[in-house]
UniProtKB/Swiss-Prot annotation:
It comes from Pyrococcus furiosus (strain ATCC 43587 / DSM 3638 / JCM 8422 / Vc1). One of its GO terms (biological process) is amino acid metabolic process. Residues 179-182 are annotated as: Important for activity at high temperatures. InterPro entries: AsnA_fam, Asp/glu_Ase-like_sf, Asparaginase/glutaminase-like, Asparaginase/glutaminase_AS2, Asparaginase_C, L-asparaginase_C, L-asparaginase_I, L-asparaginase_N. Catalyzes the hydrolysis of L-asparagine into L-aspartate and ammonia. Displays no glutaminase activity, a highly desirable therapeutic property. Keywords: Hydrolase. Optimum pH is 9.0. This is L-asparaginase.
């Protein structure tokens, strides 16, 4: 089967220099150094070579366009990418590139491929096995697991087991030499489409005790077109000793204000507590069980299509690519 590997940089492609590790290896060099032998019918393309902290929305556009041009030429595509923003990229690609007819698999490593104890060989082998599975969609392969790209979050900063599938089944797992498929997502059978429209003017604000409405007003004045609040637990807005709820009620008529949770699992339910119900009445849009990465990139993508707050509310609460429980 014919596979394309696209290099974006990251730890997997990094070499240690005077200023620490820096992405510099080509994706072909990464494969060779990792000792991957089962990729004889592979092509290689170096699109970027950067630390993923440097990834910007324009890089998503470049990658989505490149993927779109190649999805009908290959049986699978692997994207090597830095881990810090990998889940943002896999989520945005899921929204920009609909109904890919092949597996598109993101992977990387926590330890550079040049190091003896690198996890690059395991992750690349897992990605190659899944890229030849014929299971279409956008995925992340890491530490012997395959996860849906729009349901993946980085949860550890040092461990090889850096990513988890959030509120969604693990798609496949490596057991010995075999990749065992546990779950196949259901997607529409439509033709692959590319829709790059998005607006990156989204601000994420973490709710903490004492937070006031000033920062929300400032965000609107600075031209931000959407706000995501990382709230507590199941979600809610404080109404005691703060102008926050009143401010949000005023601003939610102008821009979408979405609430996700600081907790990793289970998502938000704004109907559960009074603080949540008051937030709903104030116009806050619940993110449901979406990851923070999916919430942010979905809002960016929707803002590229409409400014109408009511339309945005409907789309944010609609499952588009598997990011949200129906």
């Amino acid at each position: 089967m014919k596979i394309l590997l696209i290099g974006m940089g990251g730890t997997i492609a990094s070499v240690k220099g005077e200023n620490g590790y820096e992405a510099s290896l080509s994706v072909k060099e990464v494969l060779d150094i990792a000792g991957i032998k089962d990729c004889e019918d592979c092509d290689f393309l170096d699109l970027k070579n950067v630390d993923s902290t440097l990834i910007q929305p324009e890089d998503w556009v470049d990658l989505a366009e490149t993927l779109y041009k190649n999805v009908k030429k290959y049986d699978g595509i692997i994207v090597t990418h830095g881990t810090d923003t990998l889940a943002y990229t896999s989520s945005m690609i899921s929204f920009m590139l609909r109904n890919p007819p092949i597996p598109i698999v993101f992977t990387g490593s926590m330890i550079p491929a040049t190091e003896e104890n690198s996890d690059a060989p395991l992750n690349l082998q897992t990605a190659i096995k899944f890229a030849t599975s014929g299971i279409r969609g956008v995925y992340v392969a890491f530490n012997g697991k395959v996860m849906l790209g729009v349901r993946t979050s980085k949860v550890r900063t040092m461990s090889r087991d850096a990513f988890e599938s959030i509120n969604y089944p693990i798609i496949a797992e490596l057991r010995g030499e075999d990749l065992v498929v546990n779950f196949i997502p259901k997607f529409n059978n439509g033709e692959v489409t590319l829709d790059l429209r998005h607006d990156p003017k989204v601000l994420v604000i973490k709710l903490i005790p004492g937070l006031s409405g000033d920062i929300f007003r400032a965000a609107v004045e600075l031209g931000y077109r959407g706000i995501v609040i990382e709230g507590y637990g199941a979600g809610g807005i404080p109404y005691r000793g703060s102008d926050l709820l009143q401010t949000i009620e005023e601003l939610s008529k102008e821009i979408p204000i979405v609430m996700t949770t600081q907790a990793m699992y289970d998502g938000v339910d704004l109907t559960r507590y009074k603080v949540g119900r008051l937030a709903l009445r104030a116009g806050v849009i619940p993110a449901g069980d979406m990851t923070k990465e999916a919430t942010v990139t979905k809002l960016m993508w929707i803002l590229g299509h409409t400014n109408n707050v009511e339309e945005i509310k409907v789309l944010m609460r609609k499952n588009l690519v598997g990011e949200l429980r129906d």
